[in-house]
Regions:
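Nucleotide-activated sugar donor-binding and catalytic core shared by glycosyltransferases
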Residues: 1-236, 241-373
């Protein structure tokens, strides 16, 4: 009898990292792969599913306008019980730190279904930064039986927390697997035509804890540097959150060196990252993606759960203070040595075989842990 492996995810970042795993698991004859999406993000989730040709078996469709964390939590918990009871999976795989991940793991705990946590062990140890993600992933870490840590540092965190080392597997990050299928040398886009021979600055900003004054500080710093550097052109695919859009309009509106565009598909996002001069972000996943292309990343957050990149030199944590962001952004444009030191640092996040390692583990096969250079 085939082992039933159910994957549950609901947001764009989860889908980017889980869809390659879905496709890998479906190649394994000993496994039956079932996909359930919660629809925590709707439009942005569907874009990724289409890119990787993944068709969900179940869709909870929980998203509604103006949804709160309470809405997401109760919506998933109420709807996923019936799916789990119908499928009766042998293991449920969740990813990272979203509300979908936390609530699904909680439902599995209530039904005593084993949980596999993909991208386990990331920590800031401040449950309000990032919020609510840090709490979510710590809570899932208590429940999970399989812990697929992307790096040695993530695995070490789990060991310090008392997890059984025999249930911790260092796999690399599945996002590196995803990028092997999305980046194209012959890629074209109207925004790249607009940038031309200039330096592309790729921007993302959306974090819940940065809403309000921190985001205004971030945008003001970016605009100041762009105003001083005519060789730079910035592209910012803006998040759907109306609070983010209002802040961007107030601080970046009318700046002819930045194009604020609607959310782009993962295929476009990865190709923009591969072609940028540098990236400013408060995203989690982009901290892993952009270093793979040898591009510096300024992380506009006070904490990061990805210290490997900071240690390796590919990431620089700059917080949300306007002057600090301005100074660091300006330095990377004006100091070639500083730029090269970040651009040439090694990528500590994976080799593109994380999904195969996870599949091997679920099949009970021997696996070779991922070891960074």
């Amino acid at each position: 009898m085939k082992k039933k492996v159910m994957l549950v995810f609901g947001t764009r970042p989860e889908a980017i990292k889980m869809c390659p795993l879905v496709n890998e698991l479906k190649t394994r004859e000993s496994l039956q792969t079932i996909v359930c999406v919660t629809g925590q993000h709707r439009q942005m989730l569907d874009q990724v599913l289409n890119t990787f040709n993944v068709v969900p078996d179940y869709d909870l469709s929980i998203m509604k306008q103006g949804q709160t964390l309470f809405d997401i939590t109760t919506g998933i918990l109420e709807r996923i019980k019936a799916v789990l009871e119908e499928v009766k999976p042998d293991v449920v795989l969740v990813h990272g730190d979203t509300s979908t991940t936390f609530v699904t793991a909680l439902a599995c705990f209530y039904l005593q279904i084993p949980v596999g946590h993909v991208e386990a062990g990331l920590r800031t140890y401040n449950i309000y930064s990032p919020y609510p993600e840090e709490f979510n992933r710590q809570a899932v870490g208590i429940i999970s039986q399989y812990n697929f840590a992307p790096t040695q540092m993530a695995a070490d965190n789990l060991v310090r927390e008392g997890k059984d080392p025999s249930k911790i597997y260092i796999t690399g990050n599945t996002v590196i697997d995803a990028m092997q299928h999305t980046v194209r040398e012959d890629y074209t886009h109207p925004e790249l035509d607009w940038v031309g021979d200039g330096k592309l600055i790729f921007i993302t900003a959306h974090r819940r804890e940065n809403l309000g004054e921190p985001m205004h500080h971030m945008f003001r710093a970016i605009r100041r540097v762009l105003d001083e550097h005519p060789e730079c052109k910035a592209v910012y695919p803006i998040h759907m959150n109306p609070v983010v859009r209002k802040a961007a309009d107030e601080e970046l509106g009318g700046c002819d060196r930045i194009h604020i565009i609607e959310p782009i598909e993962v295929f476009d996002c990865h190709n923009f990252e591969a072609r940028c001069h540098l990236c400013l972000t408060d995203s989690g996943g982009i901290q892993e993606e952009v270093p793979s292309y040898g591009r510096p990343v300024l992380v506009m957050r006070d904490t990061t759960e990805r210290p490997e990149g900071v240690k390796a030199g590919t990431l620089r944590l700059v917080g949300t203070d306007e002057e600090v962001i301005y100074k660091n952004f300006k330095e990377l444009l004006e100091n070639q040595d500083a730029y090269d030191a970040m651009a040439k640092a090694c990528n500590p996040y994976g080799d593109g075989h994380a999904c195969a390692r996870i599949a091997d583990i679920l099949e009970g096969k021997e696996y070779q842990p991922w070891v960074a250079e």
